[in-house]
Amino acid sequence: MEMTSGSLGNGIPEAMGQNRGNIKRCLEKYIENGRRVMKLNELMDEMEIVINDVTQRRRVMEGDLGKILCFTQAVVIPPNVAFAVRGTPGNWQYVKVNSSNLSVEALSSTQYLKLKEFLFDENWANDENALEVDFGALDFTLPWLSLSSSIGNGLSFVSSKLGGRLNDNPQSLVDYLLSLEHQGEKLMMNETLNTARKLEMSLILADVFLSELPKDTPFQAFELRFKECGFEKGWGESAGRVKETMRILSEILQAPDPQNIDRFFARVPRIFNVVIFSVHGYFGQTDVLGLPDTGGQVVYILDQVKALEDELLQRINSQGLNFKPQILVVTRLIPDAKKTKCNQELEPIFGTKYSNILRIPFVTENGILRRWVSRFDIYPYLERFTKDATTKILDILEGKPDLIIGNYTDGNLVASLMANKLGITQATIAHALEKTKYEDSDIKWKEFDPKYHFSSQFTADLISMNSADFIIASTYQEIAGSKERAGQYESHMSFTVPGLYRVVSGINVFDPRFNIAAPGADDSIYFPFTAQDRRFTKFYTSIDELLYSQSENDEHIGYLVDKKKPIIFSMARLDVVKNLTGLTEWYAKNKRLRDLVNLVIVGGFFDASKSKDREEISEIKKMHSLIEKYQLKGQFRWITAQTDRTRNGELYRSIADTRGAFVQPAHYEAFGLTVIEAMSCGLVTFATNQGGPAEIIVDGVSGFHIDPSNGEESSDKIADFFEKSGMDPDYWNMFSNEGLQRINECYTWKIYANKVINMGSTYSYWRHLNKDQKLAKQRYIHSFYNLQYRNLVKTIPILSDIPEPPPLPPKPLVKPSASKGSKRTQPRLSFRLFGA
């Protein structure tokens, strides 16, 4: 974003005159160590060294320069210091200050990025023909949100803009409705009503006819009469429902308004079959949680599918249709499945009637790849995977899906490729964008690439987020961060990968494609610990052994001497970002906390040789060293990753029985599903202030925020709570109850599913309206994919397996089917190993 009149940059010269001496010393301190990139904490720390007088420091901080320093990063190239200033979420300005004469110059984002590149690749920075990526140049005709507070409310914004478009061109809606069909059957309208005028007149006549019928008259009773007038099924299951829907459409055609547009598209029969991509890790329903690259995303999707199917069934019924929705979760088939079902091609999803997991293998020139592949090494296999998956999906669904949803970088890229090929509405869900998790991973990509292949990943992320018709985020912070920290998507607005490309405009967080839809927790598993009649008593004995047995075995090490103490508990993957070793070290160093509570950690393996994940191996070794260094046995229990979700629900409640707490200490957490699970069980929760948990928890009301970068402060905050709750039992109860209330009001899967299906319906029409611009953008993306992504992927080694015995002849694919009775409680189909 350019520096504009009235911006912070224009106030700096005056501030320089008022605080010239202090500011000059401050800037001289910044350039003292030569060229470098400085983060906010470094800027503030070095300013405090130079301006040690508290009054003078406050004067500087209250001025324009202080405003800059509080929300910025800087590039130091003596004698200049260039600042990237974040005034509000999504709004960035750039300014360069000369430390010698304090002159100020406004910069463009391109100029600022070039200065940053100068530190890492001077030749690239000076290359006038260096590749610049500017997706924003293709979106100039579309409307944008304007206020930071409105970010993530894209659907409401689109509905408001549709009103103007429909007022100017109602025929576009008529054409869209005429295109609706499913399984070869026309829906809502036929060609008899091919103009807006004809439709308006017919709606008036239909209203008169319907007013004479009892509201509960089934649609079938007047279906033939309606068909003669140009109306097909899909308006509703009864005369009353049909009349309501038609009146909403009549009002839209006469005077469109956002509320009626929302109501109408919520009733349009547009979404029946959904494909969800989640490629990496071990995607399954049992025995997978805690395996490499396998965690909350799997839980999220399985719960998501149940909610979406329930919502679709309810909608299809209210539309007066008898179609059955189908949802396919498409993932990788892994022949070496580690005692999981990840080597089964087709698997019904428990708790659903019409939803299945479809697994497609990775295929190389040597055949099917049998071994697990890290999410960082997955990119060479995705193009072939997309092709094979598309063939199977079209076969199973007997046609195209109506909506494709991608998950994480790999799933989003595959979803983008397939949606573009088939012309289908596409949504993306990031879960986590790795660029924000690894500091300076863009400008220092050459250091990271041999291990993480971030050049391929960042390129794939740019492709998928710009291909999507709408983007689902769990929280505002995921998109645009907080006052103190930029959001995951916000960090992709402009950045540079020196030597590859300079992103002038990667994504705009004011884009109306962004929508917040927070997931919930499965309430059949995660319910309050006080609901004694619902609790899973069959797990009591095994959980007691898990927590309190004095023996050490392959499932738990360490022990708890004082069983009367409350337990603080954390459960996550054992990697650097999740920070379980960080929590352990906080606890180990805080004597007061150790005296008050026990610590139980659930995650990973004990034996590093059992892990194939690079980060997990490192964290395993670190955890063992902490146990020995601080002599934690007696107050500490380390339990291996637990894959039984039902027992995990009871584990949360068992911790609540001790009047303990759940602690989520991640350096960054995009959403925080375990936070939702813990609070749903009535467990008092402390969670990171970096990411989604900061929105889930109202600090000091429904739980507590902790700072993962300040272990001493965080551990003291936990200790303070337990000291108070030890003196006043109602103090613990208050936070438990407030946490439950917060979940019930804001975080349920029913709310989520309703939002997502509404998005799918409305954005399908928005896509129809903007198809020419969509095509132009796809051509730009196609070039970027072919000229950049494909070449980057070639640098990633293709894995190979030890030669296996010749495969058995393939058998025909068994298509999914479901009985008309109750929902599945266990698999009922026979399966074969894909390609074997």
Curated annotation (Swiss-Prot):
GO terms for cellular component: extracellular region. Its EC number is 2.4.1.13. InterPro entries: Glyco_trans_1, Sucrose_synth_GT-B1, Sucrose_synthase_pln/cyn, SUS_EPBD, SUS_N. GO terms for biological process: callose deposition in phloem sieve plate; sucrose metabolic process. The keyword ATP-binding does not apply. It is found in: Secreted, Cell wall. Its main location: secreted. It catalyses: an NDP-alpha-D-glucose + D-fructose = a ribonucleoside 5'-diphosphate + sucrose + H(+). Residues 805-836 are annotated as: Disordered. One of its GO terms (molecular function) is sucrose synthase activity. It is an enzyme of class 2 (transferase). SUPFAM superfamilies: UDP-Glycosyltransferase/glycogen phosphorylase. Keywords: Cell wall, Glycosyltransferase, Secreted, Transferase. Residues 270-748 are annotated as: GT-B glycosyltransferase. Disruption phenotype: No visible phenotype. Detected in the whole plant but more precisely confined to the vasculature in cotyledons, leaves, petals, anthers and roots. Also detected in developing siliques, young immature rosette and cauline leaves. Belongs to the glycosyltransferase 1 family. Plant sucrose synthase subfamily. Sucrose-cleaving enzyme that provides UDP-glucose and fructose for various metabolic pathways. Functions in callose synthesis at the site of phloem sieve elements. This is Sucrose synthase 5. The lineage of its organism: Eukaryota, Viridiplantae, Streptophyta, Embryophyta, Tracheophyta. The gene is SUS5.
